[in-house]
Design a protein with these regions (language model features):
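Juxtamembrane intracellular "pre-TM" segments in multi-pass secondary transporters
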Residues: 1-5, 187-218, 402
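Pair of pore-lining "gating" transmembrane helices in MFS-fold secondary transporters
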Residues: 3-31, 35, 212-231, 312
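Short amphipathic helix-loop junctions that connect adjacent transmembrane helices
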Residues: 28-45, 235-251
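Residue-level signature of mid-helix packing/kink "hotspots" within the transmembrane helices
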Residues: 56-64, 114, 147-148, 261-269, ...
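Conserved MFS/SLC helix-loop-helix module at the cytosolic interface between two early adjacent transmembrane helices
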Residues: 60-97, 275-281
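Paired small-residue
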Residues: 89, 100-108, 294, 305-313
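Cytoplasmic helix-loop-helix junction between adjacent transmembrane helices
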Residues: 105-143, 328
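Symmetry-related core transmembrane helices of the 12-TM Major Facilitator Superfamily/SLC fold
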Residues: 166-183, 373-389
Length: 402
């Protein structure tokens, strides 16, 4: 097996374990807060949002830093540093005695949440541009698979062993992934990086992005996709309750989440392959339109089964969006600054993770949950229009130049 293929297999496994582990603790965070003292329901709900959101906010701020450091020092050392940081943050969560300590550790976890983005940059840098979509789509399958099994496994462990031991087990699994990278990954130097030249400053990188519309449009698209996806997630359990009632609510809410993940898992690699063949922007426009269309029946759903079917179909479209966006950036970004550029893209991704629940909550509180589905459908449609306009503008520019 070649070094590149071996690295890919190991990073895929590490992504699976890290993604599964970080999502294992999500289902019971609010329940864990309740055990720390006697709080009102409003306090628990408010601080559950703070504790959940602070990780994404900090990750949004520091992602370019990890990308830039990876370009300078190598991706492997960043994988080990961020993985160890996540493992320690989660380990200490098992010892907290107040919600403020938990908040601080979730903040610290956000500062070191660079494992999966860095692994993406590493594999992208070692992959030929002609097969980037297929490779990155396959890599995302590891992340999606982990996020599918993580919440289910975390809930089972919490019921069986309690919250504290679940934190310990989660930390151990992530640290095992770090050891897997340490002993298994062999980073290959890139020709662009080994050439002697003056390193790019952050100002030069930002200037490069600004003068490449294809790059910043993709970053805006990343934010829009994540905003749309996360705008519904906090409301899904409430919507399932409206459609199905309170019987086995947690189980059926989990099914609604898993339906999307399963759809993504099935076609993520295929969409990436099609993007390599026919152009990532062309595939992205189709997927954004499909995602928009599949959201409208969810707003009109009269039963849980209808919701599950269209959550699954939406997942099939969603599975190709981020891999194709990343592959399109891979084609445009020079290898010497690719990590930092992907870091900025990840920042936009985390910004969408923060904005999505905020927008969904505001819309649903002022109108209805169904209204949030309509707004999300519009966001995906707007993304398709933005990409189509950019494509048309580029074609017109080339025609005038010739």
């Amino acid at each position: 097996m070649s070094i590149r293929k071996k690295n890919f297999v190991i990073v895929w496994l590490a992504n699976f374990f890290v993604s599964a582990s970080t999502t294992m603790i999500v289902p019971f965070l609010s329940l864990y807060i309740e055990t720390l003292s006697t709080f009102s329901n409003g306090f628990v709900q408010r601080w559950s949002g703070y504790v959940f959101g602070i990780t994404f906010l900090m990750a949004f701020l520091v992602s370019p830093f990890w990308g830039r450091l990876g370009d300078k020092r190598g991706y492997k050392i960043i994988l080990m540093a961020t993985g160890t940081g996540i493992a320690l943050s989660i380990l200490f969560m098992g010892f907290v005695t107040s919600v403020y300590q938990l908040f601080f550790l979730r903040m610290a976890m956000g500062l070191v949440t660079g494992f999966i983005p860095t692994s993406l940059a590493m594999i992208s840098a070692q992959t030929p541009k002609g097969s980037a979509g297929k490779t990155l789509g396959t890599l995302q399958m590891g992340q999606v698979s982990g996020s599918l099994f993580g919440p289910l496994l975390g809930g089972m462990l919490a019921d069986r062993f309690g919250f504290t031991y679940t934190f310990f087990i989660t930390s151990f699994v992530i640290f095992s992934s770090v050891l897997l990278v340490l002993f298994g990954v062999k980073e290959q130097p890139l020709a662009e990086k080994t050439a002697k030249r003056t390193p790019y400053t952050r100002k030069e990188v930002l200037s490069f992005i600004f003068h490449q519309p294809a790059l910043w449009v993709m970053m805006l698209l990343t934010m829009l996709v994540q905003t749309g996806n996360f705008s519904i997630q906090p409301l899904l359990a409430l919507y399932v309750n409206e459609l199905h009632g309170p019987v086995n609510l947690a189980f059926f809410s989990g099914m609604a989440f898993s339906a999307t993940g399963l759809g993504s898992l099935l076609l993520a690699r295929k969409w990436g392959d099609l993007g390599d063949r026919y152009g990532h922007r062309r595939i992205l426009i189709g997927l954004l339109l499909a995602a928009s269309i599949f959201f409208i029946p969810q707003a009109l759903a009269s039963s849980l089964s209808v919701l599950l079917v269209f959550r699954f179909l939406f997942g099939m479209a969603m599975g190709g969006l981020l891999p194709c966006i990343t592959a399109a950036i891979r084609v445009q970004a020079p290898g010497s600054i690719q990590g930092e550029i992907l870091g900025y893209n990840v920042s936009f991704r985390f910004l969408g993770n923060v904005l999505g629940p905020l927008i969904g909550g505001i819309i649903s509180s002022h109108f209805t949950i169904s209204a949030a589905f309509y707004v999300t459908a519009f966001l995906f449609f707007a993304g398709a229009c933005m990409l189509w306009i950019m494509q048309k503008f580029r074609k017109d520019s080339y025609a005038k130049a010739s």
